[in-house]
């Protein structure tokens, strides 16, 4: 009888050890900057403050958009974004990346991304002020998945459009 109890105890301990080892392999560290939206992933890489076309302060977010779907997709038609500050939705901003070509910072949003590929996209919104936190919500365009990040504008750097290599001056 005593030998049966010892065998049963050993078996129970072996099963417990087996379950604890299996759990170790499945643990993943969550990246708070990674947002999964169904077939798409967004990785928040950072933000800065730039002037829009009217000289107002705008927050410019930089994200990696990964298409894990089966067909080509663009950020513009796959993700719905909303930025809020002080409880008010922020307006989209026109921020030029190049004054000579009138290219804006959001041009990457139109890029068709093949399945498994990633493209860097930027998005720009007018700030109400440069001190209050901004909450960015990203949702599947036609789905239920969403994710949020909060950004402190007071910790962001100010940036200007890329240097003009033609020798001209920005307006």
Model-derived features with residue positions:
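The feature marks short-to-medium sequence segments in extracytoplasmic or secretory-pathway proteins
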Residues: 53, 66-117
């Amino acid at each position: 009888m005593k030998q049966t109890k010892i065998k049963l105890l050993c078996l129970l301990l072996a099963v417990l050890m087996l379950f604890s080892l299996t759990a170790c392999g499945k643990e993943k560290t969550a990246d708070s900057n990674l947002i999964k939206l169904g077939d798409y992933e967004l990785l928040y890489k950072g933000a800065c403050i730039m002037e829009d076309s009217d000289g107002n302060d705008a927050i410019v977010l930089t994200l990696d958009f990964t298409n894990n779907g089966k067909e080509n997709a663009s950020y513009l038609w796959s993700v719905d974004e909303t930025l809020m500050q002080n409880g008010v939705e922020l307006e989209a901003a026109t921020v030029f990346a190049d004054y000579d070509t009138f290219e804006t910072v959001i041009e990457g949003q139109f890029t068709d991304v093949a399945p498994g590929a990633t493209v860097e996209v930027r998005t720009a919104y007018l700030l109400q002020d440069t001190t209050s936190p901004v909450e960015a919500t990203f949702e599947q365009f036609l789905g239920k998945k969403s994710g949020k990040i909060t950004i402190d504008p007071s910790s962001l750097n100010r940036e200007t459009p890329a240097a003009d290599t033609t020798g001209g001056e920005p307006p």
